[in-house]
Regions:
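P-loop NTP-binding/switch modules centered on Walker-like glycine-rich loops
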Residues: 183, 187, 191, 195-272
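Conserved ABC ATPase "signature" region
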Residues: 83-84, 134-152, 261-262
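ABC ATPase NBD coupling module
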Residues: 22, 27-31, 85-101, 119, ...
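A short, proline-enriched helix->beta-strand linker immediately N-terminal to the Walker B motif
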Residues: 176-180
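Conserved ABC transporter NBD signature motif
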Residues: 76-84
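Short catalytic/signature loops enriched in Gly
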Residues: 2-4, 17-28, 33, 242-331
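Helix-to-loop junction immediately C-terminal to a conserved catalytic motif
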Residues: 68
Length: 331
């Protein structure tokens, strides 16, 4: 079996959100660490789309930024095609960096309003290639055609385009240096619903044509069902379930995954019993001991309150849940 393109093992990213040093010393306060991502592990195979889902603040976007080197690791290991991602900051790491690119969430904020579209798309080529100006102009025109725009658009400014067109420009920029792996951080969440499907279908077409691999971040489960091959579910910085898309939607195992799917309106599901999950997301600065989901879980017991679960195989899924492991709920 071929080696996965992306391998993430026990990756964590903590942020120091303590008050200033002098204030802490005078008040006798300890340092405060926000565990945005706290030990996630997963793999992404070549040509595959792995989607990460979860409520706001669960760490999805932090994982995205870790995978392209925008955030360093507090602990753990991330490898791209067998190479440690830390090599991107070393001499010679530019070749590795250009193989993975990112599409950002907000097409209104991620494009420089003072630059023409041609310069925006050509910027990665200036850094990573030795193309002549004429070659860059021709390449920009080809990229614009590839994402459904006209080559003449490279002389225009971002404000002259709609949101969907701006995101197409962002996609063209990400493709400028022929990457193998794209990290897509909620690329359609800022777009009108009528435009979302067009952009998603474009991304799927590009994946087939170019053999791309995607990490797709989203909170919209309908979008995830449309684009993903496998789905990872995050809660308070931890991965609670990873499963093939069809298996996860047909047979969710972790109680949190069940809660997310139960929130999807289902016209045909009238009369089906639904289990409401009480409580709110805990304070990430002071997360619960053991399984962080236990205050909201109807299946929690003493083990859940005192021992953090690890991911274990359950059918075709990897689930971090004591209740599933012990057979207290169907796994």
């Amino acid at each position: 079996m071929s080696t996965p393109l992306v391998q993430v093992k026990d990756a964590a990213r903590w942020f120091d959100v303590s008050p200033p040093w002098l204030e802490r010393k005078l008040a006798g306060k300890p340092r405060v660490m926000l565990r945005a991502v706290d030990g996630v592990s997963f793999e992404i195979n070549r040509g595959e789309t792995l989607a990460l889902v979860g409520e706001s603040g669960c760490g999805k976007s932090t994982v995205a930024r870790m995978l392209v080197g925008l955030y360093g690791l507090t602990r753990g290991d991330i490898r791209f095609d067998g190479q440690p991602l830390s090599r991107m900051s070393e001499p010679g790491g530019r070749e590795l960096r250009k193989r993975l690119q990112m599409i950002f969430q907000d097409p209104y904020a991620s494009l420089n309003p003072r630059w023409r579209v041609g310069r925006i798309i050509a910027e990665p080529m200036l850094t990573h290639t030795k193309m002549t100006p004429a070659e860059r102009t021709a390449r920009v025109g080809d990229l614009l055609r590839q994402v459904g725009l006209d080559p003449s658009d490279q002389s225009r400014y971002p404000h002259q385009f709609s949101g969907g067109q701006r995101q197409r420009i962002s996609i063209a920029r990400a493709l400028a240096v022929n990457p193998e792996f794209l990290v897509c951080d909620e690329p359609t969440s800022a777009l009108d619903v009528s435009v979302q499907a067009q952009v998603l279908n474009l991304m799927k077409d590009l994946q087939r044509e170019l053999g791309l691999t995607y990490l797709f971040i989203s909170h919209n489960l309908a979008v995830v069902h449309h684009v993903a091959d496998r789905v990872g579910v995050m809660y308070l910085g931890r991965m609670v379930e990873v499963a093939p898309r069809d298996e996860l939607f047909a047979r969710p195992r972790h109680p949190y995954t069940r809660m997310l799917l139960a929130a999807i309106p289902d016209i045909d599901g009238t009369g089906k019993p639904r289990t409401a999950v009480a409580g709110e997301v805990p304070n990430p600065l002071n997360p619960p001991s053991g399984c962080t989901f236990h205050p909201r879980c109807p299946h929690a017991n003493e083990r859940c309150r005192g021992e953090a679960p690890v991911g274990r195989m359950a059918g075709g899924a990897v689930v971090a849940c004591h209740a599933v492991e012990e057979g207290r709920i169907a796994g």
